[in-house]
Amino acid sequence: MASSSNPAFANPAFQEQRPGLTPPVAQTSFATSSHQAADLAAQAQLEGAFAAPSAGSVDTGRMTVEDTVIKTVSLFAILLVTAAVGWIWTMAGVTPATPQNVSILPWMIGALGGFVLAMVITFTSRKKVRPALIFAYAAFEGLFIGGISAFFEYMWPGIVVQATLATLSVVGVTLALFASGKVRASKKATKVFMIAMIGYLVFSLINVVMMMFGAFPAGSGGPFGMLSNYTIAGIPLGVIIGVLVVIMAAYSLVLDFDSIQQGVRNGAPRQYGWLGAFGIMVTVVWLYVEILRLIAILRGNN
């Protein structure tokens, strides 16, 4: 199994276990059935996650794919509710007389709160999974998504529907390919992914610093720094990088699905389904924001 880049899956519950060793997760001994049989069972669960009834995780006290799917859906329900709040809050001051009064406060509160909670969840989940913190994270992410979506929609009407459909398409195709066994994570691909991720983070940091120090004056070509001001063969740099980042996010989803499947094979306690749902949300939110920015760059000043 290739290790996931998502910090939510750094917990031993989602790591491949060496024969004869028991992972130290909540002082619980995991199932000891053969790896091959467990792998087949986990694969069958994933393929039938949306068609089969609940696998009875309440009775077994173990993590299942179906239960993780239910937890993921519940987190996104919370996100959608608070996203509506963030959207309304962002546009509350906009009137025909003051069309420029778009508030970025929900966006900033959501981003900061989500980041802090993500760090807390990641570093405390090795000892205990706290669903309440994950619920709060989903709520803050909703404020962030609602705020940034309202702002982008104000600038580029119709962009939110485009980004949402594109995100759902990427997630759906990735899940279908993984469930069918046609796409799997590998150690080599994961190494390339990690290198690309580090490179992208460094580039993003440099881009933000340049924007902060006025390297790209207003009206110089776009609001995204190097992403919208530089071109390669006539194509905005942001489009080229954006496509690559969407592919990276899709592969990150594959790693997330693989980690959840590994947790099921390990017989992880049921509460770790919340951690799996949290990890999926982190990746999907990242994917949506990247697609939103990519479409904005493509649409330019239209």
What are these regions (language model features)?
Residues M1-N302:
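A hydrophobic alpha-helical transmembrane-helix feature that marks the membrane cores
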